[in-house]
Amino acid sequence: MMTYEGKLIAEGLKFGIVAARFNEFITNKLVGGALDALLRHGVAESDIEIAWVPGAFEIPLVAQKMAETKKYDAIICLGAVIRGATPHFDFVSAEVSKGVAHVGLETKLPVVFGVLTTDTIEQAIERAGTKAGNKGFDSAITAIETVNLLKMIQ
């Protein structure tokens, strides 16, 4: 029986990050966490590019454009969608998650969903580097591992 498991080896890999400016207080912390993880695992700063988009809804389109350039080994998508008093949260959350998944399947490239979808600002803060860790860091680790896993399976 063959078992595959991705390694956390990132030297020489290139990463694109798509980050939403909306809820920038949160997203900046997610980007910081992602950069920390990538740099700790040997990615050169020159091998990381960040595209800032207005809001989470724009993430899938820009992620697809970045993936299509074939410059990156993975794309990390970061943002924060926080529930409000209207159904807007439900529409945005659903479309962003579907869009990010679609880009990965279409381009055969790891496209990691690191968009927080929380009920409160407090929950978002907890997931951006306090009580619940940093989901930006976690997303970068997922990207590294998935890149290496796909290389093993080919």
UniProtKB/Swiss-Prot annotation:
It comes from Desulfitobacterium hafniense (strain Y51). The keyword Transferase applies. The active site is at H88. Its EC number is 2.5.1.78. Pathway: Cofactor biosynthesis; riboflavin biosynthesis; riboflavin from 2-hydroxy-3-oxobutyl phosphate and 5-amino-6-(D-ribitylamino)uracil: step 1/2. The keyword NAD does not apply. It catalyses: (2S)-2-hydroxy-3-oxobutyl phosphate + 5-amino-6-(D-ribitylamino)uracil = 6,7-dimethyl-8-(1-D-ribityl)lumazine + phosphate + 2 H2O + H(+). Catalyzes the formation of 6,7-dimethyl-8-ribityllumazine by condensation of 5-amino-6-(D-ribitylamino)uracil with 3,4-dihydroxy-2-butanone 4-phosphate. This is the penultimate step in the biosynthesis of riboflavin. GO terms for molecular function: 6,7-dimethyl-8-ribityllumazine synthase activity. One of its GO terms (cellular component) is riboflavin synthase complex. The lineage of its organism: Bacteria, Bacillati, Bacillota, Clostridia, Eubacteriales. Keywords: Riboflavin biosynthesis, Transferase. It comes from the Bacteria. InterPro entries: LS, LS/RS, LS/RS_sf. It holds the Pfam family DMRL_synthase. Belongs to the DMRL synthase family. This is 6,7-dimethyl-8-ribityllumazine synthase. One of its GO terms (biological process) is riboflavin biosynthetic process. The gene is ribH. 5-amino-6-(D-ribitylamino)uracil binds at F22, A56, F57, E58, A80, V81, I82, F113. (2S)-2-hydroxy-3-oxobutyl phosphate binds at A85, T86, R127.
